[in-house]
């Protein structure tokens, strides 16, 4: 569930048009000596480390402007350009909106995706989430939509199951409690309001643990405004997958320690329903592992929810 082994079939550096590669080199001020595609993630866009002829390294992301994910990439570029320098995120050096392609060049961050089953690496992630809440409250992007506006229509998986024929392979506990799950799911937006800039897609493959022990948070493609605790709770199923007492973690972490447990359960319920529904859709052609990831996420979150609710 960490996402580290979830790799889409990414565009490669040599698949970019010659004119786009030439413009990247021109703006970078040096020729590209080598390009290494980065593993992990579910987007099929280009994501690569570029080794430049003057000894510098940069990180490039690019996608065809007619691609179905182009709007997501554009949001990421716009968000990265407006993040404060104190945010634990790679700096955007420049972006290009050339005919046919969206391109972003970031500072290259050495490191590896954190392992949530390693106490020191998990501690670094948890410290970074506390830093995000402190640095990004109030939101430096006050014009963003709220999490209820962005995610309210999406996080209704249990309701859809309840209103239609539930899937034949739905687990017994979810089937037995479907109406109650749909009711609890419907309340999550009541608790989620806030003025923190949220990432909303924190996974280990969207973070890098640097050699100095600090975490860099990547891929700000789904930002919105909401309660500061949302990002930690959304990451918690990936932590729970390693057998860690996540209820205790939430009860002691500064971002979540004073949050009503009902609010946490409602949001977990909404996440579980979303993943349960999405995992049953056809897989995107260039991201074959996405539905498996969502199925695992649904299973872990539903199991945890059952223990929390004691239904």
List the model feature ranges, each with a label.
Residues 1-35:
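Juxta-kinase regulatory segment immediately upstream of eukaryotic protein kinase catalytic domains
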Residues 2, 112-175, 193-195, 224-225:
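A cross-family kinase active-site recognition segment
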Residues 39-52, 59-60, 183-230:
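Active-site acidic catalytic loop and adjacent metal/ATP-binding pocket
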Residues 41-44, 98-102:
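Short acidic/glycine-enriched loop/turn segments that link adjacent beta-strands
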Residues 57-99, 115-131:
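A conserved alpha-helical element in kinase catalytic cores
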Residues 101-112:
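Conserved short submotifs of the Hanks-type protein kinase catalytic core
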Residues 143-144, 282-295:
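Hydrophobic/aromatic-rich alpha-helical bundle segments in the mid-to-C-terminal region
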Residues 229-258, 268-286:
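Active-site activation/catalytic loop segments of kinase-like enzymes and analogous catalytic loops
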């Amino acid at each position: 569930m960490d996402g580290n082994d979830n790799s889409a079939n990414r565009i490669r550096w040599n698949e970019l048009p010659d004119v786009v590669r030439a413009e990247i080199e021109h703006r970078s001020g040096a020729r590209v000596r080598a390009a290494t595609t980065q593993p992990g993630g579910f987007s099929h866009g280009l994501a690569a480390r570029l080794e430049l002829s003057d000894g510098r390294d940069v990180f490039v992301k690019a996608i065809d402007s007619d691609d179905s994910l182009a709007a997501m990439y554009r949001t990421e570029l716009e968000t990265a350009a407006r993040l404060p320098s104190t945010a634990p995120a790679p700096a955007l050096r420049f972006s290009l909106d050339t005919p046919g392609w969206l391109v972003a060049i970031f500072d290259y961050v050495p490191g590896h995706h954190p392992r949530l089953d390693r106490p020191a690496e998990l501690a670094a992630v948890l410290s970074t989430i506390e830093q995000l809440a402190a640095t990004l409250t109030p939101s430096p992007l006050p014009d963003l939509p709220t999490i209820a506006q962005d995610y309210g229509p999406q996080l209704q998986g249990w309701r859809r199951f309840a209103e239609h024929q539930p899937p034949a392979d739905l687990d017994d506990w979810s089937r037995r409690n479907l109406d109650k799950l749909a009711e609890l799911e419907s309340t999550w937006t009541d608790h989620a309001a806030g003025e923190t800039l949220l990432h909303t897609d924190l996974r280990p493959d969207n973070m890098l643990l640097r050699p100095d022990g600090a975490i860099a948070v990547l891929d700000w493609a789904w930002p919105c405004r909401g309660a500061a605790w949302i990002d930690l709770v959304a990451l918690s199923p990936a932590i729970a997958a390693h057998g860690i007492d996540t209820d205790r973690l939430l009860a002691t972490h500064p971002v979540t320690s004073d949050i009503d447990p009902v609010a946490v359960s409602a949001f977990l319920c909404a996440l579980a329903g979303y993943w349960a529904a999405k995992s049953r859709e056809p897989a995107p052609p260039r991201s074959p592992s996405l539905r498996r990831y969502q199925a695992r996420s649904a299973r872990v979150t539903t199991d945890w929810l059952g223990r929390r609710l004691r239904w």
